[in-house]
Amino acid sequence: MKNIEELILKAVELQSNGLVTGQIANELNVSRETVTWLLTRSKKDVVAPAPKDISVTWNSVGQSSYRLRCISQALCDMVIEKLERTQQDADLVIGIGLSGIPIATMMAEELEIDFAIFHDYDDQKGKTNQRGIFSRNFADVEGKKCIIVDDVVSSGATVTDVAEQLREVGATPIAVAVIVDKMNADMIANVPMSSLVRITRVD
């Protein structure tokens, strides 16, 4: 996306196609707050201050299985480096739907461990105050030592939800791996985070 006007048009288009705020945020790789601002900004008579956020577009990676594999291997290397320091081994890689799934799939293959999927509550057609769920069609997370994978971390809410639910079923989140970290954090939900790109906003 080249500018704010393009983001506004894309947000409005996605909303008209039936996507809810969280889904639009995932698609545009911005926070929910930014999506709300973009949608209200599309109404010309509304003036609100812009939220402090950054749109991330990584479709040049996502459209190529080769590039996805390279990114996944780099994330594996970073996670292994952190796990070796704490002498831990992972049993399972969890991909957060939608964009974390292809990366997590390749990471699980590279690490030769099981794979699971977490569906964020925003995938559940706009239901509010709902928690995400682990898919029953993939590996069981109970009692496992897990690596959580997503494309972009903006506020950390989804990763925190995953980590909390893992702990509730006796699993241990031992690492988080993302392409882009917009929080500029080493830890999220008391779990070490590795990212290929860390964004720091300087005002």
Curated annotation (Swiss-Prot):
NCBIfam families per UniProt: PRK02277.1 (NF002620)
Positions of disulphide bridges: none
Pfam families: Pribosyltran (PF00156)
InterPro entries recorded: GfcR-like, PRibTrfase_dom, PRTase-like
Swiss-Prot/TrEMBL keywords: DNA-binding, Transcription, Transcription regulation
Family of this protein: Belongs to the purine/pyrimidine phosphoribosyltransferase family. GfcR subfamily.
One GO molecular-function entry: DNA binding
Species whose genome carries this gene: Methanococcoides burtonii (strain DSM 6242 / NBRC 107633 / OCM 468 / ACE-M)
Domain free text: Contains an N-terminal DNA-binding winged helix-turn-helix domain and a C-terminal regulatory domain (or effector binding domain) resembling phosphoribosyltransferase (PRT) domain.
The keyword Nucleotide-binding appears for this protein: no
GO biological process, one term: pyrimidine nucleobase biosynthetic process
Gene designation: gfcR
Highest taxon of the lineage: Archaea
Name of the molecule in the record: Transcriptional regulator GfcR
CDD domains linked to this entry: PRTases_typeI
